[in-house]
Each structure stands twice: as structure tokens, then as C-alpha cells.
């Protein structure tokens, strides 16, 4: 059985130690994150497993607040001829370590009990004497220390790296706990591994994380594909002369709910448990707070609604009618309420039976696909410590609405594929299952 690696996370107050752990653990509830010093007052332990095997124990430590005071004590009460670790041990046995420098003592004890430490640096900060003092006393613990830069975006690290090099700290990593980068995390673990006599545990962790990342991506795209097929197969029939407006509104409501359920599954998959999709979510991008039937969203994603007199029919509606004679009059009748009806298809069976069939239009299916891929991108690039609002970059629809993937076109003629038709979710899921895998491969973020 492999002995787990123990890793202390240390640094000045409010540099992002707990945030780093939240992101590495994929746990947005670990510890407490505030924009205030000394939020963490005690050492907290967390564990990364690979199945039943424990790989790495991570220790969140209190912030170092008065390393200069500790260094002064060491220089006054210990001999420069003693090894650094002996001087630290003398400090930890002192009265001051249990009173005046209680927080610093907790950090140093944990470092000495660990295999190595990560020293978290706020890259926005200038190089100050207090940080030099912290690195000095940490180095006396005689454990490998790797600096980790947080908040690195648009920051010049030259002054920092020069200072670190003068202290013989040549291996470091940049890892933004807010704007998550999976490959950046892998580099962090890889850099840590280079500082150990044996790297087998961290190599195993790296391989596990790569497998997990690929699994999450595959499962997420399958969830999206399954939702799109469910929505595409959703149909309702009404009599030829019935007002479709009430039915259309019900259909829109059911698709909204179906989308929300799928989005929540993506949140759970990526372990953002306490965040909800919708207007109550403070950090969600504007696009996700908008109704999927909002015409502005079509413009946002560059989705064209067609040409000619019927182009405006889809705007704000999101559902077509495969209808029969008299459809033009019908469109005029409800145009003021729902933006019009697009008589885009003629179904001979409906015509004979005097029926209208309502179903989700290609533009709305394309919009839904674009929205869900955007959400996936957000979840894959957001650290679990992030608390701020996200601004989406300009993103495009995954396909031309006039050229839906064959799987969605097939769904539109197989009403049993939709749980909204059958009210039997598992049965409908089984009906469309064979097409989920192929559609998911066409969903490119």
C-alpha cells in the first residue's frame, strides 16, 4: 500500500490558500473564503483519493501575519550556528509560540510534519520584506517548498522570480484559483513531483486527473445531446382551427424546465453543488439568465431565422407548426401575441385529419445547443473558489440552423423519444439512447 503524500499549503494572509485548495479539491464548500485577513484560524485537512487509495493529504494553514517578529525572536534566542530546523524546534517549544506567535507556530508545525509545502503568493503584490521573512523561516523547516502564484493574469512576475532564485527556489507554478486551467493544474502537480525523491504518487494523481477530466467532458456532452434529442422530439397536436397560443406557451415552459434540469446535472457533475442555474445565481452569465425563447439570444449567437416574409415568425416563438390549409390566417391571428407562426411544413396526414402539429424549431434547437456548450465551457474554466460574475466571450452556434445534425432531424419525427410526450423519462431515454453518442461527438464547445 502506498503511503500518502502530505502537503501543507502556506503563505501570507489573504493570498488565496483556501481558494487554491477548493480548486484542487473540486470542492466549493471547503473552508471559508473572504476578502479579509486570517479567515483560516486552524489547520484543516483534506484528502485526494484514487478509488479506495489515499494519494495526497492537503493541509490548509492559517495565514502568516508576523513572520518578521518570529525571525527577530529566532535571531535573539537561538544560535546562528544551529541548523535552521533546530532553531525552529526551539521556537516551537517557547512560550511565545503558544501565545504571541500562535498562528505562525501552527503553520511551522504543519510544515515540519508534512512532506513538502506550497507557498501561495498573490502575484499582484510587490516583493516586500515580510514575504522574504516568511520564506526564510519556512526554509529553516528543511522541507521542499514550491511557490505558487495566484492572480497571475496580466502580472509581471520578474521581481518575484528573481527574489525566489536568490533563495534557491527555482521551481514554481502559476495557478489562478478563479480562472481555472486544467493543464495549469497538471503543471502544478508535475512541478511538485520534480522536487520529491520519488514522484510515483503524483504521477498517479496526474493520470487519475486526466482520466477524470476526459470522463467529465464525455458525460457532459452526452447529457447535452440527450437533452437536445428530448427537446427535438417534443410535439403537441391541436385541432386545425384551435388557437395554438396556450399550447405553445405550455411547450415553452416545459422546455425551459427540461433545460434547467439538464443544466443542474452539469453543475453537479462538475461539483458546483451550491450554485443554481437561473436568475438567483449571482455569477451566471447574462445569456443563461435570459429566457431561451428570447429573440435577443438568437442575435447573440448569430443564428439567422430564415428569409422572406416568414423570417420574423420564429423570433420569440421557438416552436413551428407543421400545419395544413389556413395556416396563413392562423399566423395573422396570433401574431400580436407570440410573434407569428411559421408554416414551414405541410403534413398530408395532418391535413386530412384537420390537425396541427407543433414542435421545436431548428433555430431554437441550435440556440439550446449553443447555450449548453457555453455553460460547459464556463464550468470547465471556473475555479471552485471563484465568486465573481462571468462575462461570456463571443461564441458561435455549433452548426447552421438550416443544417441540423441528422440525429436531431430524426428526433423530430420520433415523438416517443421525448419524455415530455410520454411522461416516461426512462422509456424515452432508452428510445433515443443509440443516437446520444453520435450527437455528443458533434457538440464542439
Predicted feature residues:
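Non-catalytic alpha-helical scaffolds
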Residues: 1-17, 116, 140, 193-445
